[in-house]
Amino acid sequence: MKKILALLLVAMMVISLAACNNKETPDNSQSEVQSESSQVEEPEAVVAELKSLKNKEYGVDYVSLYSKFGKETSIADVEEDPETGFAYIEKDGVKYELGLDFLSMAMVYNTDPAGSDYANADEVYVEWWKLYMQRWNALLPEIPLYSNEYYDLYNAKIKGVEEHQTNPYWTPALALIDWTSEKEDNSIIIGNTTDLSGKFRYAVFGASSPGAADNDVEKLIEGLETVATYTKDGSYIWNPTVVVEHSETENDDGSKTFTVKIAEDLVFSDGSPITAKNYVARAMAFSTPVAAQAAGKDHMALMQYVGYKAFSLYDGTNDGAEVDGVTVSKVMSGIRLIDDYTFAVTVDPEYLPYYYDIAYAGFAPTYLKVWLGDADIVDDGEGCYFTDNFYEKNGDTYVVAEQMKKSATNTDTTYPYSGAYVVKSYDNSDKSAILELNPNFKGNYEGVKPSIEKVVYKKIVSDTQLEDLQAGGIDCISGITGGDETNEAIDMADKSEGKYVYTHYSRAGYGKLGFRADFGPAQYTEVRQAIAYCMDRAKFAKDFTGGYGGVVDGPYYSGAWMYKEAVANGMELNAYATSVDSAIAVLEEGGWVYDKDGNDYVEGVRYKKIPAAEAEEKDINYQSKDGAYKTTKVGDDYYMPLAINWYGTSNNPFTDQLMTGFMENDNIKAAGFVVQNTIGEFSPMLDELYQAAVYGYYSGSPLYNAFNFATGYNSAVYDYAYNLTIDPSMYDDYSQWYIKDLADAYWLK
């Protein structure tokens, strides 16, 4: 960033000419004081180099830029490049480009308007959001392909659907609490094209994000949260059905304590009382090595709270030991049990201020045995801790970890539930679950209790879903999309003489071609950009939605308030207009200019040279699905093929359209790509994306780097903090797109 110095006044004092004749200069001939002004520029700041992270060690070679400068940076320090839309800060004469991790963190943790021209935190949030969106659009971790109108089609015997409509934040699984059923058995059958897996009690168990169908069931069987995060307008609010009193205290050390008193009449589905212990149990459990072993993933549930680091390192034997400079403690000091119905949580100053800080007080009750086995939670005045049997081991395995694994897929009434319904049964063969009314449920955040006695949640196939509805196999088809399917659904309802009704709303989300953006060619920005240039996204959206939708250029909902404000503030996004020439240009600029032998590219599939120092094992072993195109070694360097391995989901019109719109696209071939695919079920696809056996299907060898599925925004809260981290200790557990933005690295050497 150039800084112009103040004008310098240079006084040129001319001494009398007595040196020649030893005479004084007369007053009227005295030289006038002359001055001149000139602009002097500081040397332009050095722009920090963006370097590969491969084969480099976090904490030794580099750390995150946000960890270095984040807390001290305000929006007033940021300069936006008017041509690229990228954001920069200058520190000690060095100009740093701000990456996705930095921007996503600053969006929620750096909203103080002090020292800036912004009036309040909302305006600062919007500016960070705009800068984040512009960078996301440039790096393109995934390609949005359509955003559409959603149509929900119902059996007319389900009443209240028009008076209590669904919307982007209020899905049928939430809305049915206001509906009634005139069917003889007082039931509703909900269909979803996404598979159930049986992970209902904690749908995100072992994963970075939950499966959509599992998440729906979890919403039905879990409830009584202190902060309602699923509301009709998508906002976060205190839940008056649960919370009797709450307070916030800003402490001298910069931490913040939330104290929450719950109602004393809350009970689980079996009538057993719900106390403060039940609210802190799951979060505490999933901050331990016990849960990390069970889930194959460290959920770090209490990461933002005081005492987390010390508590998370406790393994049952090392209280007081020093580990990585931290004194281990069996006590979680930031979680307190004040009395049977009051708990307090203290947020670490590192995570404050926070734009959505009400979320820090959001906890939901869990029956203790589900995640603790026979262990208990105790508070002797210094904080909460588990009794010793929580950490009991059988060899190298935590006994309670095995209990947790079973609980994660428990689908009956072995343990009670806190939500509006309980799971009576689950059939893994046809992916269906039967839920029954919880008679002890106190109500949702509006105090509403459901009247429909039975909910059947089942897997449906989009090709036959309307026939299923007509045959009585389902009562609700939610999220109908695609031109043909939408037209068919509307036509069926209009001609049904009142047997079927529908509602519709604009979707908060989009269908996408997603990537494992750290693997194979998809790890390179230019490859993702080239695919976008090759595809005709506008035509794809029009063909798929039949005119009931369009396309978005980033991860946003066009109805969201921050999007509207960002557009008003001049946000500019690349629409990636179809152009094979543009695709080739970005590929050539990115180094895809070779053939497999390291010679100049002429035709066929392109290759990129990867220097040996930057080649990781996954790069060296990369190949197309059929093995015809492999990374080759020429001299000391490696050459990776421009081969995309795509996993598409079966019985999905979106997959069908991608066959022609992506895989067999003439532009794709002309640009030098080869695309190969597999069609399979949703859960195995997720395992390939995660490169982990979260659902038990992953083979152990990474292969696929492109996937088609969808993104949905079920809350008005927009927060991707930590989801774009480059810190390896958090990356696998938190990464949303598996992308490492090179601008997010601060180099130590």
Question: What name fits each language-model region?
Answer:
Residues 292-299, 424-440, 456-519, 530, ...:
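Extracellular/periplasmic solute-recognition and catalytic clefts
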Residues 119-140, 189, 275-284, 340-344, ...:
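Alpha-helical secondary-structure segments
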Residues 118-123, 130, 244-309, 338, ...:
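Aromatic- and charge-enriched surface segment that lines or borders ligand/interaction sites
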Residues 157, 295-397:
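Surface-exposed binding/hinge segments that line
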Residues 205, 210-212, 218-222, 230-233, ...:
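Gly/Pro-rich hinge or "lid" segments in bacterial periplasmic/extracellular proteins
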Residues 237, 244, 248, 424, ...:
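Append "and occasionally in soluble cytosolic enzymes with long acidic Gly/Pro-rich linkers
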Residues 168, 172, 191-251:
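N-terminal lobe/hinge region of extracytoplasmic solute-binding protein
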Residues 41-196, 534-569, 650, 656-664, ...:
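Detector for C-terminal structural segments
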